[in-house]
């Protein structure tokens, strides 16, 4: 089933990282955390994912062509910390706002054979005084946030397979970064 009509900002964001990391979705079951309009979901399906479980705290955000795709199990108005996994998950995608990635990664750290392709938004890892109107304008602060995040990953048994800054900046100009992770066995 084609997903060509759903190339949103999210789609274009994950596209650069997935290509750079040579990430393989073929035949995999994917959990998309913070699915929003479905850009990450669409990309995963277009590149061979068997099924996507899309979890979104909001409602009515997923684009219509995706809402009716039988390969997608959409869970709207759902907090990821209340969500109960019923499927074996091969890949976790995450693009969340107003929330640190750390508690999400910690929550799923029992999934030892799962790959993680997640987007770090430094503005949501930052202290209030490190931002101006929600934007990190100081590159030194951004680099320190990234360094602290990577230290946290290592302390919590995550292995960084690859990482790169996003080709597209966030809507307000924040430079986001993708991580391809696995857990140490």
Task: Cite the ranges covered by each PLM segment.
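Class I SAM-dependent transferase core
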Residues: 1-25
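Conserved beta-strand signature within the Rossmann-like core of class I S-adenosyl-L-methionine
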Residues: 113-127
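A short, conserved alpha-helix within the catalytic core of class I
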Residues: 99-111
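Conserved SAM-binding loop of SAM-dependent methyltransferases across substrates and taxa
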Residues: 37-48
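S-adenosyl-L-methionine
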Residues: 53-101
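Conserved class I S-adenosyl-L-methionine
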Residues: 25-36
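Core SAM-dependent methyltransferase catalytic element
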Residues: 168-185
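Conserved S-adenosyl-L-methionine
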Residues: 158-167
């Amino acid at each position: 089933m084609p997903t060509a009509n759903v190339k949103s900002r999210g789609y274009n964001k994950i596209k650069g990282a997935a290509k750079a990391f040579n990430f393989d979705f073929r035949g995999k079951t994917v959990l998309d955390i913070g699915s929003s309009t479905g850009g990450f979901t669409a990309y995963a399906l277009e590149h061979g994912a068997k099924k996507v479980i899309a979890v979104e705290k909001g409602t009515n955000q997923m684009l219509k062509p995706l809402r009716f795709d039988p390969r997608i199990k959409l869970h709207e108005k759902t907090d990821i910390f209340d969500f109960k996994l019923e499927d074996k998950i091969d890949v976790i995608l995450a693009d969340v706002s107003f929330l640190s990635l750390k508690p999400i990664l910690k929550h799923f750290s029992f999934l030892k054979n799962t790959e993680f392709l997640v987007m770090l938004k430094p503005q949501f890892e930052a202290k209030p005084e490190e931002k101006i109107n929600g934007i990190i304008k100081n590159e030194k602060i951004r680099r320190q946030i990234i360094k602290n995040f990577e230290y946290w990953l290592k302390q919590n048994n995550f292995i960084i397979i690859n990482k790169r800054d996003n080709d597209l900046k966030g809507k307000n100009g924040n430079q986001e970064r993708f991580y391809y992770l696995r857990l140490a066995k």
